[in-house]
């Protein structure tokens, strides 16, 4: 595809769900620089919810000037297929507390795009159901 050009992919998506896409060529660096995005395939009959939220979690290794740090050839990071960052984001923004009305039904589509971090999540006393 030429620089600045476009290309339209046309393909069937047989399964509904929450997915994400990212490169597999030099993926440590490209994913580490943020080349990722959610891919949501809706059901034919989606559940009734008050809000359907996609939360893409990531951590970034930033240098002292708050730029994405280099060091893409670090053997430790490559051996572990990822690197721990020092700054967490949700949907590319600083982590914020999210509120909801009492009794609201929320669908959270959670994607962990961090290359080497396991993110612990909790519902803090709320009733939650794992769908998939």
Model-derived features with residue positions:
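Extracellular/periplasmic metallocenter environments
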Residues: 1-50
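Structural recognition of the beta-strand scaffold that forms the well-ordered cores
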Residues: 9, 53-56, 130
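Solvent-exposed beta-strand/loop surfaces of large extracellular or lumenal domains
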Residues: 123-132
């Amino acid at each position: 595809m030429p620089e600045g050009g476009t290309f339209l992919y046309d393909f069937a998506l047989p399964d509904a769900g929450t997915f994400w896409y990212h490169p597999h060529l030099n993926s440590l660096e490209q994913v580490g620089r943020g080349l990722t995005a959610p891919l949501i395939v809706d059901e034919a009959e989606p559940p009734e919810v008050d809000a359907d939220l996609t939360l893409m979690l990531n951590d970034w290794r930033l240098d002292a000037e708050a730029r994405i740090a280099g060091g893409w050839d670090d053997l430790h990071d490559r051996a572990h297929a990822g690197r721990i960052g020092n700054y967490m984001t949700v949907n590319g923004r600083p982590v914020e507390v999210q509120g909801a009305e009492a009794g609201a039904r929320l669908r959270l589509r959670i994607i962990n795009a961090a290359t080497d971090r396991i993110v612990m999540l909790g519902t803090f006393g709320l009733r939650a159901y794992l769908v998939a």
